[in-house]
Design a protein with these regions (language model features):
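Short, positively charged low-complexity motifs
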Residues: 1-4, 20
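N-terminal pre-Walker A segment at the start of P-loop NTPase domains
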Residues: 21-41
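Short phosphate-coordinating micro-motif centered on Lys-Gly-acidic
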Residues: 23-25, 71, 108-111, 116-165
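Hydrophobic anchor at the beta1->P-loop junction of P-loop NTPases
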Residues: 52-54
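P-loop (Walker A) phosphate-binding loop of NTP-binding proteins
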Residues: 57
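Conserved lysine of the Walker
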Residues: 62
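Short beta-strand-centered segment that lines the nucleotide-binding/catalytic pocket of NTP-utilizing
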Residues: 75-90
Length: 165
C-alpha cells in the first residue's frame, strides 16, 4: 500500500449542502490483499455506530471491501451485494453490520426509514451508492480507478450546512 499526497481537507457541495470533509487515509490497492488490509485498517478508524457511504464505479470493489470488513468483525459466512434485496444484515460478535446498496433506487430517500430502523444498535452501517449528506453518513469511502490499480480514500464527513449560510 502506498501513500500519496492529497489535500487533507475538502469542501463537498451536493444537493444544496456544503460540508467539510477530512481525509483520514489514502491507499493504492494493487492486489486483493491490499483491499483486505484496507478493510482492517478502516475498521480501526470507525467508531461504533459509524455510517459509511461507499462510492465508486461498477466493479470498483465496493462489495469486496464490505466482505473483508464484515469478516474482520467475525462474520464467518458469505457476503453478497444487496443490489436486489437492498439491505443485508450480518451478525458479528461486536453487533450487527448493515450493508445496503442503493444503486437500483431512483429515489433513495424512500428507503431511509427502513435503513434507519436497520441501523438502530448496529456496530456499523455500510451503504453502496449512497449520498453521504442524504444518509447523514459519518464517513465516505471513495474507490476510484488508478491505472491498473484502485485508489481508496476514507473521509470523515462533517455536518452539512445550507449553501450561503
Amino acid at each position: 500500500c502506498g501513500f500519496k499526497s492529497r489535500p487533507r481537507h475538502q469542501t463537498e457541495a451536493r444537493k444544496g449542502l456544503v460540508s467539510l470533509m477530512r481525509l483520514l487515509l489514502s491507499r493504492r490497492l494493487s492486489r486483493l490483499e491490499d483491499t483486505q488490509a484496507l478493510a482492517e485498517e478502516v475498521l480501526g478508524l470507525l467508531p461504533r455506530g459509524a455510517l459509511v457511504a461507499i462510492e465508486g464505479p461498477l466493479g470498483a470493489g465496493k462489495t469486496t471491501f464490505v466482505g473483508f470488513l464484515v469478516r474482520a468483525l467475525g462474520f464467518p459466512g458469505r457476503v453478497t451485494s444487496p443490489t436486489y434485496t437492498l439491505i443485508h444484515t450480518y451478525p458479528t460478535p461486536e453487533g450487527p453490520v448493515v450493508h445496503a446498496d442503493l444503486y437500483r433506487l431512483k429515489d433513495p430517500s424512500l428507503l431511509l426509514g427502513q435503513l434507519e430502523a436497520a441501523l438502530e444498535g448496529a456496530r456499523l452501517g455500510l451503504v453502496e451508492w449512497g449520498e453521504p449528506h442524504l444518509l447523514g453518513a459519518s464517513h465516505l469511502l471513495r474507490l476510484s480507478p488508478e491505472g491498473e490499480a484502485r485508489r481508496a480514500e476514507l473521509w470523515e464527513v462533517g455536518p452539512g450546512e445550507e449553501k450561503g449560510v
